[in-house]
């Protein structure tokens, strides 16, 4: 893993290939490995960058006092692109929708194209039943670590409040252990995740900030999974309608984590969009 320092702390990332930059984002309690099944299926001639955002599965805690609320996490993404001096970026969103707000904050100047897999949008922060579970767990002492331990038990992991509505296919044990080890082992990682989960999520403001994507003039692909129950199908269509140069497509048979459920379909759509 490589690493780079930004104002909030040190961000680790994986990078492969050379060419136009493509930045693959991930969701809460996950890291870059959520993309492992898609990565070898993508076209050559691309610089694929996969940051590990401070969303609970990161191995290096951020600086004490860093702003890791939703607003702060948006800045983390912008600062990461800045630190690597990435221009004409294709930014790929999945699950976590914070980076959708770059345009609203005037921080999207390095982003030329965007791809939206099922992700938080409008007032769906935190999203659905899994999001409600995380929010409640963050309010209870020891709650997030208890939830992480539940994720490590296969039959519990498949229940709707955990990963049952996130992935249609079982999420492998090795991935879940990797994602939960930092939270269970490092108080700094727990501190960072609590800072995010306990931060403000104002519905009307989030709707306005999502709708600011109407100002985004680059190409966009909304690659939604209509079978998922966490990110409403309506939101995918609304996102596509917002952006002047957006195209809508679907990945049938997948839930939120379509890159795990249907990696070939996701890679095919991404490849067509990127080349």
Functional labels for PLM-detected ranges:
Residues 14-60:
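Conserved HGGG/HGGXW glycine-rich cap/lid loop of the alpha/beta-hydrolase fold
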Residues 49-96, 268:
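Active-site loop/oxyanion-hole signature of alpha/beta-hydrolase fold enzymes
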């Amino acid at each position: 893993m490589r690493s780079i320092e930004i104002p909030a702390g040190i961000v680790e990332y994986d990078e492969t290939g050379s060419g136009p930059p493509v930045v693959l984002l991930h969701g809460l309690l996950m890291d870059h490995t959520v993309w492992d099944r898609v990565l070898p299926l993508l076209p050559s001639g691309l610089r694929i960058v996969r940051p590990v955002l401070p969303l609970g599965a990161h191995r290096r805690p951020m600086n004490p006092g860093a702003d890791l609320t939703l607003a702060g996490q948006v800045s983390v993404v912008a600062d990461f692109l800045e630190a690597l001096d990435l221009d004409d970026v294709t930014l790929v969103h999945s699950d976590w929708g914070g980076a959708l707000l770059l345009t609203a904050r005037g921080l999207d100047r390095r982003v030329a194209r965007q791809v939206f897999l099922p992700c938080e949008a409008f007032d769906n922060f935190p999203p659905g039943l899994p999001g409600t579970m995380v929010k409640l767990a963050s309010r209870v002492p020891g709650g997030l670590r208890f939830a992480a331990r539940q994720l490590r038990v296969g039959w519990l992991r498949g229940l709707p409040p955990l990963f049952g509505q996130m992935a249609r296919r079982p999420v492998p044990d090795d991935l879940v252990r990797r994602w939960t080890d930092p939270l269970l082992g490092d108080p700094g990682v727990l501190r960072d995740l609590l800072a995010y989960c306990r931060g403000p999520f104002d519905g009307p403001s989030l709707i306005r900030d999502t709708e600011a994507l109407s100002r985004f003039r680059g190409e966009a692909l909304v690659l939604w999974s209509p079978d998922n129950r966490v990110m409403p199908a309506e939101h995918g269509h609304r996102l596509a309608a917002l952006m002047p140069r957006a195209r809508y497509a679907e990945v049938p048979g997948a839930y939120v984590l379509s890159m795990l459920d249907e990696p070939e379909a996701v890679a095919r759509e991404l490849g067509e969009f990127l080349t």
